[in-house]
């Protein structure tokens, strides 16, 4: 999945979704160039250029990934 957050408000909303209790035991990362960032860390997300596309790497069950994809649909972009 590829996401683009564009602004601080979108980054906050995205971080709130991936940090929710249903994903608390699942590692979710964002890859931006050579950097890999914990997607649950707002500070980490804000440390990269929000104008760039980031690859979301989900380390969990497929059904959880499908649920997350629906929740973050507005941040997803075509690859």
PLM feature spans:
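Conserved beta-strand core positions
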Residues: 26-28, 54
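Short amphipathic
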Residues: 1-6
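C-terminal structural segments of small proteins and small subunits
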Residues: 49-79
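Amphipathic alpha-helical interaction surfaces in cytosolic regulatory modules
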Residues: 10-24, 35-50, 65-71
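Short, glycine-/small-residue-enriched flexible loop/hinge segments at domain edges that mediate gating
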Residues: 29-34
